[in-house]
Every structure is written in structure tokens, then in C-alpha cells.
Amino acid sequence: MAGTATCSGEGGMIPDERRYSSKWFYQCIQSRYGFNPHHLVLADGCEFFIGQGCKVGLGGHLMGQKVTDQVAEMRSLPAGIDQRSPARHPDWLGPDDLALKIQEIREATDWQIPIQLKLGAARVYDDVRMAVKCDPDSIYIDGMEGGTGAGPHLATEDTGVPGMAGIRQARKAIDDLGKSCLLYTSDAADDRLS
């Protein structure tokens, strides 16, 4: 990979992916499938998956036929069985809990890796205001352009907000709070958005 950042995605680390990635983010998802603190310390960053642009506010349903032996091993699940992911993190009730979770990850990694929050583009201004107060290093606005193999067709194909459409509201939310936070979107992960 030519200097690109790669994310583990939903479900753990693939050793070869980590080995060949110059920058690798470990994604912490709602279901905690495949979560391993030993893998977290191998990461260049941690991304908390809070929402996905192509299915904002929805959990996931991965059909059993997609749970191959490799997927099952990464996620610590039985192969061939349907799997569901909740829409929210079960140990968070609100922004205060998220701030505590960010602090836990910072302490577990000795403050050596940045923390990113992935938000689905929906109520961008309000969501970013809450997220920034939790003190992440960056926020990733995921627009409807992203894909998923675990969502209802109507949500993944016919709804959503484009990532670039959410950037203006996200930037305004950060500026209104007088805070500083890197901002990215799936359309243009670029420091010019910061």
C-alpha cells in the first residue's frame, strides 16, 4: 500500500494487513467482535465506530454465508452463523461515557496513538458538538458513499447524506465551540478540511 491509512474494519486484525499497512487504525465497534487489547497496541490509531453514513442509526446483520472461517477467526465467532451488531455501544449511554472510554484507550496505549471518532452523516452539527467535547484527536464524517455488507437495502442504497455535505456543519460545530480537531470525510480525507 502506497502510504495509505488502513482501518481494521468491523472485526479484528488480519496480521498480513497490519504488516503491509504503513498506517493502520484499529476499529472499536459496537458488538466488540474480534476486539483484542493486544492488537490495539499494535495500531497507529484507534477509531471508535459510532455510525456509518450508509446506514445511520442502524445496527448490522451479517448473513451466515458471509461468516467464513477467516471472518469467524478474526471476530471470535462460529463460522456460518448469522451475526447481529447493535446500533450503539452497549457500555455508553451518552457523551460522558464516550469521554471515559477515550480516556481508557489513551491510558491502555500510554497516550501513544490518536483517537478518531467515526460518525455517520445525519445530524452532523449536533453530533460533532457532542463528539468534540469528548476530546478526540480527529472526527471522520462518513457519508452515504460508504458501503456495507450488513444493512437493509433501503438504508444502504436510497438514504443518507453525502460526506462533503456534512463537512460545513461539522466545521461550524467545532468553530462554535472554539475547539481544535482534525476533520475528515470519505470524500476527501485531507488536512485542508481541518
What function would you assign to each model-found segment?
Residues 184-194:
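Single conserved hydrophobic/aromatic residue that forms the stacking wall/gate
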